[in-house]
Amino acid sequence: MIDIKAWAEYVVEWAAKDPYGFLTTVILALTPLFIASALLSWKLAKMIEAKDREQKKKQKRQENIAKAKRAKKD
């Protein structure tokens, strides 16, 4: 079984002995996650904008239908 305490001590020792190598490794490991996060955020923003446009379009249509019905009654 993996000894987490020993692994954590190894990582801390590695970071203390070679901080630039440690930071480089961490940044390289996290970069794909940052890219994925940015891509998913962008896609979500586009989906929300499309949904808002569709809702505004439906609301405008309903208002026009209601206006036309009122005009027919008069």
UniProtKB/Swiss-Prot annotation:
It comes from the Eukaryota. It is found in: Membrane. It holds the Pfam family UPF0542. One of its GO terms (cellular component) is membrane. Residues 53-74 are annotated as: Disordered. The chain crosses the membrane at residues 20-40. It is a single-pass membrane protein. Residues 53-66 have a biased composition (Basic and acidic residues). Its main location: membrane. Keywords: Coiled coil, Membrane, Transmembrane, Transmembrane helix. Residues 42-74 form a coiled coil. Belongs to the SMIM15 family. This is Small integral membrane protein 15. It comes from Danio rerio. The gene is smim15.
